[in-house]
């Protein structure tokens, strides 16, 4: 199979889940010509089937809810649930510092808005730095009517995920 490629892109994003599409949005907004490729005939990756939830300490929605959290608590929690010597402290630091900025960017530059989950605890809320809620978020529902023809491109959601049509 010999197919010719006669396209020019600055960034090629592989996949169409939360992380991939956020990367594509940021690259596009930064002036790059972006191509998103997806092996499936449907969009959304595992983010679609899992409900699109994210775990970001100190996010804007938790701050707005006056949640008790801190960067140090997030560090302590991640350390408490990670095998000793098996994590890269620089990557963890980047995650907890930049995660809230990512949520801010999406909130300010896209239609993606999240709902704070004040009663959705960390997996181990009693561990050092653990919290009883406000770190996990899920996307606000999007009307299927707004998606029009693009609705049929979305990966099937988990059976327990709510989808509103109007």
What is each stretch, according to the model?
Residues 1-8:
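A short, basic/flexible loop-to-alpha-helix module at the beginning of a structural domain
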Residues 2, 16-17, 40:
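Alpha-helix N-cap/helix-initiation motif
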Residues 5, 30, 40:
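Extracellular/periplasmic catalytic domains that process cell-envelope and extracellular macromolecules
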Residues 6, 26, 84-85:
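Generic signal for short, ordered secondary-structure residues
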Residues 11-36:
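N-terminal Rossmann-like FAD-binding beta1-loop-alpha1 element of flavoenzymes
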Residues 39-166:
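Conserved N-terminal/central alpha/beta ligand/cofactor-binding core
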């Amino acid at each position: 199979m010999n197919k010719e490629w006669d396209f020019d892109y600055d960034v090629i994003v592989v996949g169409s889940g939360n992380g991939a599409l956020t990367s594509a949005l940021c690259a596009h907004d930064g002036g790059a010509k972006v191509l998103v490729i997806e092996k499936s005939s449907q969009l959304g990756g595992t983010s679609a089937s899992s409900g699109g939830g994210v775990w970001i300490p100190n996010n804007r929605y938790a701050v707005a809810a006056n949640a008790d959290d801190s960067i140090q608590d997030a560090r302590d929690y991640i350390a408490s649930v990670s095998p000793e010597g098996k994590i890269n402290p620089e990557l963890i630091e980047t995650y907890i510092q930049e995660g809230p900025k990512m949520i801010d960017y999406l909130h300010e530059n896209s239609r993606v808005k999240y709902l704070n989950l004040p009663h959705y605890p960390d997996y181990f809320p009693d561990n050092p730095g653990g919290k009883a809620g406000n770190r996990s978020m899920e996307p606000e529902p999007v009307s299927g009517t707004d998606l029009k023809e693009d609705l049929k491109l979305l990966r099937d959601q988990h059976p327990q995920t709510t989808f509103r049509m109007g």
